[in-house]
């Protein structure tokens, strides 16, 4: 792993969280979809890898999950410890998790896998600390989406300092299946869909729009994908 590259990523996130705070991220409501997809229970022990300021952990904590988070950014860790005081928040590298084997029922990584310097090592670590019948949920960026194509390939706005990257649907499937995961379900990112359907009157939305839905376009064109996974050996 390139230490210099890792330090640049840490510095970028420290500056971003220090100056933008929670405004850098989607709102808390957007994280409700991950709670539903995982079907979280109060008995679950949850690890949020690259937890940021703790938006997902806050929701998990409210249903009495045992919550743990880790992030490389000191600014993010300070925010998370203040925002979710009931969670156990660690400063550390997601590619070398400081937790015992078989520790967690649920492992999530929301919008961060594509930023890891050593993706395979990060995935191996998440498998190591997860229990035998654990659930995994990852939000990852799609390199085939129209937005990515315009911003990154045409306008060249890719944030290389923050190690911003993406993969196609087939590439992500290959990454997960070749690194010890079974893919249970794949959904499009729910937040853009939630914003669109929010204009539909509530009484209609409640009857016609499912809480977790498959979008209006073929999955491969989604801006981001949500993967629900398990270990390959379970």
Language-model regions, residue ranges each:
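A C-terminal cap/extension of S-adenosyl-L-methionine-dependent methyltransferases
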Residues: 151-153, 184-234
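A short glycine-rich, Lys/Arg-flanked "PGG" loop and its adjoining helix->strand segment in the class I
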Residues: 120-132
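Conserved class I S-adenosyl-L-methionine
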Residues: 1-40, 43-52, 55, 135-159
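A conserved beta-strand element that flanks and buttresses the S-adenosyl-L-methionine
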Residues: 108
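Acceptor-substrate binding/catalytic loop of class I
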Residues: 154-171
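Class I SAM-dependent methyltransferase SAM/SAH-binding core
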Residues: 53-96
